[in-house]
Amino acid sequence: MSEIKDVIVQGLWKNNSALVQLLGLCPLLAVTSTATNALGLGLATTLVLTLTNLTISTLRHWTPAEIRIPIYVMIIASVVSAVQMLINAYAFGLYQSLGIFIPLIVTNCIVVGRAEAFAAKKGPALSALDGFSIGMGATCAMFVLGSLREIIGNGTLFDGADALLGSWAKVLRVEIFHTDSPFLLAMLPPGAFIGLGLMLAGKYLIDEKMKKRRTEAVAERALPNGETGNV
């Protein structure tokens, strides 16, 4: 159970692919102009990570070490092609919005990295969980960045959600404030870099605060009974 918990915590927070490893920045910065686009690409990446980790882990004993990377890429490309066709069939509006960034998941360092670092060494169940956790960590980072950029740039949230979730999702669109013209800095790549930088700073501050609390808790437990640690 502790290993399962560690895999989940590492994927979602401690080893977050976007905020710690800084992998997959090209789609992260390019696609997150809206929360819907960010969520769509994040979920697609999560599905690819989960399926490729599961497949590669299952076949790891029959994969020659000398040609393992080409085999990994072939497996990843097959899964990405299937996911791309699913999005094209059932969410065509999202397919048009994401464009080239769906097939580019094949070359995403996150996917290949987890295949080599984790799936090739662990069992199928744990590898699938690792892929799902890493994918959801990246999805959360993309969604937060996309939401911030959409709110600041357009004053809306979940604009175009029907392209991802169907016609019923039109009710999810929220207008935070009205604007006649978008704030282009937030919508263009410079806004993505600024937003990502703020998120990195926020994660650092949270980690430092949590580390300080743990240190104080350990120090209090180490004190003899009746002492408070104050001079």
Curated annotation (Swiss-Prot):
GO terms for cellular component: plasma membrane. InterPro entries: NqrDE/RnfAE (IPR003667), RnfE (IPR010968). The chain crosses the membrane at residues 18-38, 39-59, 63-83, 86-106, 125-145, 182-202. Pfam families: Rnf-Nqr. It is found in: Cell inner membrane. Coiled coil: none annotated. Keywords: Cell inner membrane, Cell membrane, Electron transport, Membrane, Translocase, Transmembrane, Transmembrane helix, Transport. Its main location: membrane. One of its GO terms (biological process) is electron transport chain. Its EC number is 7.-.-.-. Part of a membrane-bound complex that couples electron transfer with translocation of ions across the membrane. Required to maintain the reduced state of SoxR. The complex is composed of six subunits: RsxA, RsxB, RsxC, RsxD, RsxE and RsxG. HAMAP family: RsxE_RnfE (MF_00478). Belongs to the NqrDE/RnfAE family. This is Ion-translocating oxidoreductase complex subunit E.
